Amino acid sequence: HEQKKSVPMKTSRRSLLIGATALGLSGCIPASPLVTSQAASSPLDPDLLPTPNASYDAWVAAFRTRAQARGISAATLSRAFRGTGFLPGVVERDRNQAEFTRTLEDYLALVASEPKVTAGRAAFARQGAVLRQIEARYGVPAELVCAIWGVESNFGTRRGDIPVISATSTLAFDGRRGEFFEAQLIAALRILENGDTTPERLVGSWAGAMGHTQFIPTTFEA
């Protein structure tokens, strides 16, 4: 097939707004990181630290049986849940997402501000070659990948430091979107089962989104 020629890069507010509506894309980023380091993590808020909760503990005990029935080994479950726990702040954030509490106009002004556009141009200048490789491999325009990267993790500088197992198990236990988050928890456990990373390094947002593009575990697996 004839390969389509690349168009000159034009990072603009429009590119970032398009990126804000295209967050369902998967498979856009290669295994190698687009930036080499993450900004230093600040201490977690107290409500994002494990809090004793007997009902959560009982839920986890029952979940382990379901997880083993779906192929997760007892060894992986033991490693994954060591040091984890109920995170009340995760439930609070799930109830008060910015996308739901701000108007669309205010939200888009935040995620596609002039400083974000400027940062996007700089990020594209640094990583343009990698972004073009992604475009050639997956057919997703490099500018759109860069926009998603900026909206989701501020170009790799805000990838989150909340343990994914604690976050997804808390939300699965909470029940508002229990089935969805139990699926994310199972997928996260499969990531560990496959040896893709360690429990200590499996961190992300309060909702379990991970990495530069903040993919949830099931999207990572797709």
Q: How would you label these PLM feature ranges?
A:
Residues 10-11, 15-37:
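N-terminal export signals
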Residues 52-86, 90:
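Near-N-terminal "mature-domain entry" segment
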